[in-house]
């Protein structure tokens, strides 16, 4: 029972701790099967909150565009983006990623980019996830993202993760054992 819902929900890559193209992965990342069609969002179960997050497939959750916690997380990430840039400028070690909206086949998903550098108001990097809304883009593909389009950021140091505000919201959808494992990694 899958149904496309126009505009009401947004897909979020849920890769706790951040995917890493250079090998330092915290364990929950898996390649996602893609097709030329957009991912379908399941209907709410009978009696369930119609605005509640919905698992689409492994590591992909759909959040309603009016989800207050997710929108607050994106706002906090945007407000603290200068801290991310300062960590980069100061040479703080770690894997740097930013989340941004990626549109293909008329569908938008929110996906991570592993940062390689900055070019003015743009961030250079490589897709850290396999997109689910088509095959135009591939994990590892080089891209540039406008700083204004960044919805979240993370610096993953293995034993500590800075930022990751949307990932923190997504933790609420994980089983308790997994959630506890990742919650202790996040720092402000």
Describe the predicted segments one by one:
Residues 2-112, 116-188:
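Mixed-charge, low-complexity intrinsically disordered regions
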């Amino acid at each position: 029972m899958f149904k496309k819902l126009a505009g009401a929900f947004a897909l979020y890559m849920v890769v706790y701790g951040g995917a890493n193209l250079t090998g330092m992965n915290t364990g929950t990342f898996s390649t996602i099967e893609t097709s030329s069609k957009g991912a379908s969002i399941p209907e709410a179960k009978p009696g369930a909150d119609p605005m509640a997050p919905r698992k689409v497939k492994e590591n992909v959750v759909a959040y309603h565009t009016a989800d207050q916690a997710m929108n607050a997380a994106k706002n906090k990430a945007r407000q603290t983006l200068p801290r991310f840039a300062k960590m980069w400028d100061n040479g703080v070690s770690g894997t740097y990623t930013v989340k941004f909206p990626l549109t293909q086949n008329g569908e938008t998903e929110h996906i991570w980019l592993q940062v390689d550098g900055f070019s003015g108001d743009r961030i250079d990097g490589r897709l850290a996830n396999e997109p689910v809304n088509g095959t135009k883009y591939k994990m590892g593909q080089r891209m540039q993202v406008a700083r204004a389009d960044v919805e979240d950021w993370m610096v993953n140091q293995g034993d500590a993760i800075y930022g990751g505000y949307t990932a923190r919201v997504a933790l609420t959808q994980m089983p308790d054992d997994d959630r506890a494992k990742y919650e202790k990694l996040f720092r402000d």
